[in-house]
C-alpha cells in the first residue's frame, strides 16, 4: 500500500479514540502498551497492512506515532532507526551522504500520527493530529535534516576523540538527534573502523519534539 492510499483513513483518525477504531475491525492485538508499539501495529491493521519487518511500513513511506497531551503537543521524541549496524557509515573519515543513508530511506516519506494516552484505559486514548512530510514536497525541511545529519555525525566523531570515556553521547541537530535506546542487558556498539566499542548502550536516531511544532505551523 502506498501512503497516499492510506491518507484518507489516517486523516479520519483525528479526534477518535482507540476504542472507536477497534470497533471497525477485528484486532489481533490483545493489549496495548504505551511504549511497546501497540498503537502503531493497530493502525497498520486498521489500514489492512501486514505486521512484518520491512524497512518501511508502506511501499513508499513510513508510519510514526507520537505520544502527546490532549492538545496535540508532543510529550516525547519520535524513534526513527537504530544506528548500531550503520555506525561506521556515520563516524568514518567521510560520513555516508545523507541522501544515500539508511536514515533518509526511513524518513523520505512519513505519516505522523499523534495520540494522547493520559487515560488508564487504552480504549479512551485519543488521536490528536495527523501530519505528513516528504522529500518530494518539503525540500527545505529535508535540507534541515541534511544539516542535522552532518552536525550529528561530526558530534559523534568528536565524542569518540575527546570525551572522557571515548564513547558517543547524545548528539543534536535542529530536528533530529542521536541518543541512547536500550534496555538491560545493554547492547554496546562496536566500530570496525576504530576496532573497539564506542558506546556502552545501543543508540538511535530520533525526531525531536520541535519537529511537530514546525509541522503544525506548516499546515
Q: Which role does the model predict for each range below?
A:
Residues 1-219:
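Nucleic-acid endonuclease domains
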Amino acid at each position: 500500500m502506498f501512503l497516499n492510499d492510506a491518507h484518507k483513513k489516517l486523516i479520519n483518525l483525528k479526534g477518535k479514540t482507540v476504542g472507536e477504531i477497534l470497533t471497525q475491525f477485528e484486532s489481533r492485538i490483545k493489549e496495548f502498551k504505551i511504549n511497546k508499539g501497540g498503537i502503531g501495529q493497530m493502525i497498520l491493521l486498521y489500514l489492512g497492512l501486514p505486521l512484518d519487518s520491512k524497512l518501511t511500513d508502506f511501499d513508499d513511506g513510513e508510519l510514526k506515532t507520537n505520544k502527546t497531551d490532549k492538545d496535540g503537543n508532543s510529550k516525547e521524541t519520535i524513534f526513527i532507526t537504530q544506528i548500531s549496524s550503520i555506525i561506521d557509515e556515520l563516524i568514518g573519515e567521510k560520513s555516508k551522504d545523507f541522501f544515500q543513508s539508511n536514515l533518509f530511506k526511513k524518513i523520505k516519506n512519513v505519516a505522523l500520527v499523534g495520540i494522547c494516552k493520559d487515560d488508564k484505559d487504552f480504549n479512551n486514548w485519543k488521536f490528536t493530529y495527523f501530519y505528513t512530510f516528504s522529500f518530494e514536497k518539503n525540500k527545505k525541511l529535508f535540507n534541515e535534516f541534511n544539516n542535522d545529519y552532518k552536525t550529528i555525525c561530526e558530534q559523534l566523531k568528536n565524542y569518540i576523540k575527546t570525551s572522557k570515556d571515548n564513547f558517543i553521547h547524545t548528539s543534536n541537530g535542529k530536528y533530529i538527534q542521536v541518543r541512547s535506546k536500550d534496555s538491560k542487558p545493554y547492547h554496546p556498539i562496536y566500530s570496525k573502523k576504530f576496532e573497539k566499542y564506542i558506546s556502552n548502550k545501543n543508540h538511535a536516531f530520533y525526531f525531536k519534539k520541535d519537529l511537530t511544532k514546525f509541522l503544525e505551523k506548516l499546515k
